[in-house]
Structures are given as structure tokens and as C-alpha cells.
Amino acid sequence: MNIPRFMPGHVLHTSEDIPQSESPLAGRRTRPVSEAFSSSYRHSDLGGYPPYGLGGSATAGLGSLSAGMGNLNLGGTTPGLQHLGGGLANTATMDSEKWLQDLELYNAILEEMATVSLDKDFKDELSSIEQWFGVLSDGERTAALYALLQQTNPVQIRFFITVLQKFGNMDFDGSPIGNSFENGAPQQQQQTSAQPSPMGQGAMGQAMTGGLGGLGGLHPHQTTHSNLNPNAHNPIYAPVGTFPSTPSHKHTSSLSTEPIGSRRSMIATPEHDLNAQIANTTAMKLAALSTVSNRASLDDRSKRSSFHQHTNSQESTPTKPGTPGGSPAPGAHSLATPMKGHHQTSSSSSITQLSGASSASPATDIKLLRDVSAWLRALRLHKYTECFKDMEWQDIVQLDDAQLEEKGVNALGARRKMLKVFEQVRDAQKDGTLGGV
């Protein structure tokens, strides 16, 4: 049996001969022989194996490297991205809370408006204000509106700004200027503008239609970062009139023409769009509810206008010579037939005499004249009943402008209306055509 010979100066070591070191492997009781031979072979050209383990320190270095590699998570995100994601989550949470608070406030206001719009006393007062406003000059109207705007809150300011912006995009005939309503509904705009109404109700309908149509089409900067807002196409964020979320719409909204270097921030854009959408939605709802309170007075004025047109057509129609009593021609009778049953409270004499008056029946009805309170209520002037509580109607109709102001009728529009009615009553009294006599 041949015993292997080793070079002079080399000693075969076992794991038990190697002293304990600070190596991470020192905790083991034995070491494999392969480690000893590997260490001896690596350092054989140095003239001998180092007595206190270079192999131990090398193993420690490899252990530290292994530990460092273990701490490296190639599948995770960098700390900067984690911080950015947390900031986006916090911003989205704050925006959601603010949106819910604003939504509760808007819903409360809308419910209150709906309740008030059904109040009969409120509608009577509002009708009186409209009639008073209708007789004011341009300067008086501007001064009155400016005084009322001083009492508005932020929600009402948003509403008025939206409505006035829509008014600014319209011509005098109610048609939109340029292509400002390209994203709207042209057919609905034509229908709303064709309905005449006092106090600019037709223009308000145009503003409502244009606003709802504008919310339906998203602008490029609104669709650029739509992936940051998962509820961008949720129905709760979309007002009435916006188109539903379809695959084609989502595909179209994902495209953007906005440059990368835009001054709009990736984080600030969803919040700005959300607040603007909430403001526009609330403004449109307020505009829709604002027409409810005027519906009764609008219907009344429409009926009154139709009645005056009917009576004027009766007066202007020529009569046949052979007809007894000067009855109107068959054509005029056919025009008067649809109007039967609508206004039968006034006598034929008062209709003929006061057909051009703005409020013929209440102004010259003797039954109402005998009750001053009921007469003023029929004229929408019941708020001034206390000014004439000790007077008879014969004395009231003789008052002039200065005397009315002394009585407490400080509003110029109300005094003008009273003077017109007083003149009608005096003329009917002279001619003996007071209704109910």
C-alpha cells in the first residue's frame, strides 16, 4: 500500500485539528474534509497553510454576500414608487371624503328647494316678484340683481357662474354662438329655445341642455389620466344626460392629444376634474329645480295670453250685414270654439272693453273690488293689503304715484302696476262696464 507523499512543509489537517474561528461555520462540530483540501490546494503555493483559517474569513465573506443577496427583492418595487403609491392612495381617500361631504350638502339643498317649490305661498310671492321685476328698467334690474348677489353662498355662486357662462355663449335669439355647443344636444336646444317664457326661462333651458351635453363629452386632459380614477365612468359621477359607459367610449377616452410636458399634474388633474364635474352637476340640478316654482305662473300667463288673442280676434273679425245681432263670421266662430270653457268668468261687455288689459277680470270685477284684500291678492299685490285696510276701492283707485308712496308702496314696479289697474277701473267705471254690475 503506497502512502501518499506530500510536499515538505505541508501537513494533512483534519477538521478536528483546525482551531475554532469567528467564521459563521464555527458553530458546527465538524467540517468536511473537502473544505480542508480545498483550502490547502488554494494556498499551496504560499509555502504553507495559514494557521488561523483564511478559509474561515472567506467563508464569512461568502456568507455576508449570500445574506445581502437574500435581502435583495428583485420582484418588489423601489421605495420611491412605494411612497408615490401611498401618496396617491391618500389623495384619492381625501378626494372621496370631500366629494361625499359636498354631495350631502348638495342633496340637502336640492331637497329643500323641492320642498319650497311646492309651497303655495312661496309660489305666490315669487310670482309677485316676477311681475314687479318685469316692469323695472334695465338700470333698476341691474341694481336689484347686484344687491341680491351679495347674499349668495358658494354653492349658489357656482350655479350662477355656470348659467351666466351658458348665457354668454348665446345670441340674442337664443341660438348658440359658434361651436360652443358641439358636444350638446341640438334637438333639445331647439325645443327649449322655441318655448317663450318670462325671466329668461328659455335661455335657462338652453343653459341646462348645453351643460348636460358638455358633461357628456370628456376633454382630452380629462381622459389622459382616467386610469388613476376607477370611478371615472361610474354612473354616480355622471349627471342625467351623459352617455353610458360603453367599450367604444372607454377605448376613445383612453386616447389623448395632450403633450407629455403639459403643465397639468398627474395627481392634480383627477381632483380638478372631479370637483368641476360635481359643480356642473349641482348647477344643472339647481337649474332644473328652479323652473318648478315658476310653472304655475307660467301656465297662468300662457292661458291669459291665449285669452287676449281670442278676444282680439273677435273684435277684428268683420261681420256679415244680414246676420242678426252682428254675429261673427263662421271663420271667427271656428277660431273661438277651442277656447270655450277656459275663461267664462267675465261678462261680454268687460271682455270687449278691456280685452287689451294685462289683468282684465280681477281689475274690473265688482265682486273683487268690494273686497280689497281679495282684489289685491288677485292682482298679486296682497303684500300691500295693510296699506289700504281702512279705505274703500272707490278711494283707492283715485290715488296717484305720490300718494301710493306715502301709503307705503315703496316699490316703483308695484306703484306702476297699481296705477295702470286704477286707470282701467276708472275707465270701466265711467263707461259703466264694471263686471258683476
UniProtKB/Swiss-Prot annotation:
It holds the Pfam family Vts1. Residues 208-217 have a biased composition (Gly residues). The keyword Cytoplasm applies. Residues 367-428 form the SAM domain. PANTHER family: PROTEIN SMAUG (PTHR12515:SF5), STERILE ALPHA MOTIF DOMAIN CONTAINING PROTEIN 4-RELATED (PTHR12515). One of its GO terms (cellular component) is P-body. Monomer. Binds to RNA. It is found in: Cytoplasm, Cytosol; Cytoplasm, P-body. The lineage of its organism: Eukaryota, Fungi, Dikarya, Ascomycota, Saccharomycotina. This is RNA-binding protein VTS1. Belongs to the VTS1 family. GO terms for biological process: nuclear-transcribed mRNA poly(A) tail shortening; protein transport. It comes from Yarrowia lipolytica (strain CLIB 122 / E 150) (Yeast).
